[in-house]
UniProtKB/Swiss-Prot annotation:
The lineage of its organism: Bacteria, Pseudomonadati, Pseudomonadota, Gammaproteobacteria, Enterobacterales. It holds the Pfam family CxxCxxCC. It comes from Salmonella paratyphi B (strain ATCC BAA-1250 / SPB7). InterPro entries: Puta_zinc/iron-chelating_dom, UCP006173. This is UPF0260 protein YcgN. Belongs to the UPF0260 family.
Length: 153
């Protein structure tokens, strides 16, 4: 009976992040693309500013990387979120499954692991497909900062 209950409980509810397999870890990503938007850092304050400028490898419509398995060959500065460095990424969105599970919170109802597709996530406008612009189209990066400091308003 206990084995049946364990198998009916989703892995993210019965395992810690450290206990998950690599495949389980990867499946937590909802594919929103927020990690794939460029961030700018203030040289004086180290404050992070979020932009709507997509990495060159992000396919904006699908919010998928063009070369995910080889992304570091194309973008050496690409983010690699791991169990070990997760605490360093304080800027992760409040909707990020990695962040939520690390904080002991449940996955959002629109998460692809619960719904079986990304449609609900896109419908909730969690993904960047509605706001992202191509890096090649950007002239002035400051025009694309989403969380502008008060001095830049």
């Amino acid at each position: 009976m206990a084995d049946t209950l364990m198998s009916d409980t989703p892995f993210w509810q019965r395992k810690t992040l450290d206990e998950m397999t690599d495949a389980e870890w990867e499946s937590l990503c909802d594919g929103c693309g927020q990690c794939c938007l460029h961030k700018l850092m203030d040289e004086d304050t180290d404050e992070i500013y979020f932009t709507n400028v997509a990495c060159r490898q992000l396919k904006i419509k699908t919010c998928q990387c063009r070369h995910y398995e080889r992304r570091f060959e194309f973008e050496p500065d690409c983010i690699k979120l791991t169990r070990e460095n997760l605490p360093d990424f304080e800027w992760l969105p409040m909707t990020c499954a990695y962040r939520l599970l690390a904080e002991g919170k449940p996955l959002p109802t629109w998460h692809p692991l619960l719904t079986g597709s990304k449609a609900a996530m896109h419908g909730e406008r969690i993904s960047v497909r509605h706001i992202a612009v191509k890096e090649s189209e950007v002239r002035d990066w400051q025009d694309h900062i989403l969380n502008k400091p008060s001095w830049a308003e």
